[in-house]
């Protein structure tokens, strides 16, 4: 039996509507009126997390918007939960993060926008907030799945745009703490998903235990130009595809000789596989 699910990882419908519920609802109404969207969501379970543009606006996070405007975090979380039928959306939680078990895959979607602590940037827990960090630690500790996916709206690695809005300029210690938790999952294959940077890229993240983490960042369905598809340091980059290349990512999972095995494919609008990575 084949189980299919679709994950949207930020900037998926709303674009920079700030604290305006009317404009936010209008963007989602236009999404809902699209026949291709209707057909796809009627046949494939879909979950989503946000990034800067469908949170508030470009590079905005936490409670501080452009020109020091206040981000109405609770309003935006409420609007989000009205528009996306995510797992655990009815839980009383300070954030839109959630987890779901999809066949053999444990999917963990992080909220990398609304929980940031602007006045503590550069400190431990400033990126996810202490509550979400504790939740992630506990969620990973109890997971018995052979495959674990962890997604966040912004990139895990620092190779693109000098990490101007992600872990590398916010919470390096917190990121390494999470990687340590992942290292402890010796019987699971853990993959990282991300978005934000226009284009599509894959990276290897070597770990001290000799294992390799993989990050797949797919943002090639948007219509805006973006940074160079390759970072200045290409030593750990698997591939790079520029923005407006109209491609989506696919992950398939199975056991190979009793061990968890995942295959990533990048597929363009014609159905051609333009990248294939066996992890």
Language model feature labels by segment:
Residues 1-279:
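Metal-dependent phosphoester/phosphodiester hydrolase catalytic core
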């Amino acid at each position: 039996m084949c189980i299919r699910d679709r994950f949207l990882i930020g900037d998926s419908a709303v674009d920079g509507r700030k604290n305006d519920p009317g404009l936010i609802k209008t963007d989602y109404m236009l999404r809902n009126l699209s026949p291709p969207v209707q057909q796809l969501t009627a046949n494939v379970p879909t979950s989503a997390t946000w990034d800067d543009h469908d949170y508030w606006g470009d590079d905005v996070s936490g409670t501080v918007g452009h020109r020091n405007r206040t981000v109405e975090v609770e309003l935006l979380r409420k609007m989000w939960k009205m528009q996306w039928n995510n797992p655990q959306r009815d839980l009383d939680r300070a954030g839109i993060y959630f987890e779901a078990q999809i066949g053999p895959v444990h999917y963990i979607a992080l909220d990398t926008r609304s929980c940031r602590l602007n006045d503590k940037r550069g400190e431990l827990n400033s990126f996810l907030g202490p509550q979400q960090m504790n939740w992630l630690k506990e969620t990973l500790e109890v997971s018995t799945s052979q495959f674990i996916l962890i997604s966040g709206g912004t990139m895990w690695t620092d190779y693109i745009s000098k990490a101007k809005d992600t872990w590398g300029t916010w919470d390096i210690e917190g990121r390494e703490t999470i990687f340590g938790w992942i290292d402890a999952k010796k019987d699971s294959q853990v993959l990282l998903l991300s978005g934000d940077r226009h284009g599509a890229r894959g990276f290897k993240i070597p770990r001290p235990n000799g294992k390799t983490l993989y990050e797949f960042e797919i943002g090639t369905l948007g219509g805006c130009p973006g940074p160079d598809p390759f970072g200045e340091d290409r030593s750990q980059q698997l591939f790079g595809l520029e923005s407006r290349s109209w491609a989506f990512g696919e992950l398939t999972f199975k056991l190979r000789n009793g061990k968890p095995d995942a295959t990533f494919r990048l597929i363009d609008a014609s159905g051609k596989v333009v990248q294939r990575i066996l992890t």
